[in-house]
Amino acid sequence: MEITWYGQSCFRLTERGSASVVTDPFDHKVAGYGALKLKSDIVTISHNAPGHNFVNGVKGYKHLLDGPGEYEVGGVFITGVRTNGKNQTGQLRNTLYVFDYDGITIAHLGDLREVPSRSQVDAL
């Protein structure tokens, strides 16, 4: 398992024989990091903001996950759970993702604003 951090909330997860994942790709003009030039099978977006949803920084992806649900892609089981955190219009705005790579489990919290509730943790 290889986990690479690119800045902000953007990581790439790779495991031999499984789909690769990029989380929360950022627009470098907003985030203040170098421009992303990544390749991945899956992109996850925790919420709709330029620092977390710049899919133009990722090439080759076939699956874009931008909300809660259960997914299975390329040997990776992914669970997305809506968590608390409100945007300027008062809407729920963050999805926490849990990735299971054949026994290796990783959580990406996105732009989590507070500790998840018991029911949110149970949903994982």
Where are these regions (language model features)?
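Core dinuclear metal-dependent hydrolase active-site scaffold
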Residues: M1-I42, A49-G51, Y61-A123
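Terminal membrane-proximal soluble interaction domains of membrane-associated proteins
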Residues: F54-V55
